[in-house]
Regions:
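Central antiparallel beta-sheet cores of small beta-barrel/beta-sandwich binding domains
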Residues: 27-108
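Acidic, contiguous internal or C-terminal segments within carbohydrate-active enzymes
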Residues: 111
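Sec-dependent signal peptide recognition
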Residues: 1-10
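Intrinsically disordered, low-complexity regions enriched in Ser/Pro/Gly/Gln/His and often acidic
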Residues: 1, 16-19, 86
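N-terminal helix-cap/turn-to-beta initiation motif at the start of protein domains
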Residues: 12-24
């Protein structure tokens, strides 16, 4: 019985730990449902970022960010950092932005 209680306490505590969002994620096209790209989510200096590491659709190969503004304008979409400056608030990653490379628009982002 004591072992069961210890096991239940252990699993309860592990459920309270935040799930890491870091790693490789696959994006999906909203309209077609096809897998569109691989995005690497990573931490740097305590902030969370996301970079497109590979475009999966043949028609997207070699595309550049035509509608982006500033330093991202004209850059290849593969390699573009699209998730920027998310801060951990103790419960979630907040106060960052995400770039839509198709439209060039920036949106508020949280995870």
């Amino acid at each position: 019985m004591t072992q069961l209680i210890h096991l239940l306490i252990y699993f309860s505590l592990t459920l309270l730990q935040p799930v890491s969002v870091e790693g490789l994620w696959i994006t999906q096209d909203d309209e077609s449902g096809k897998q569109k790209s691989e995005v690497l989510i990573y931490k740097e200096n305590g902030k969370l970022y996301g970079k497109i590491v590979r475009l999966l659709l043949p028609e997207d190969q070699g595309k550049i960010c035509v509608n982006c503004k500033g330093k991202d304008k004209g850059k290849p979409i593969a390699g573009l950092v699209i998730v920027n400056n998310l801060s951990w608030d103790g419960e979630s990653w907040e106060d960052g932005t995400i770039l839509d490379p198709k439209s060039g628009k920036l949106y508020d982002c949280y995870i």
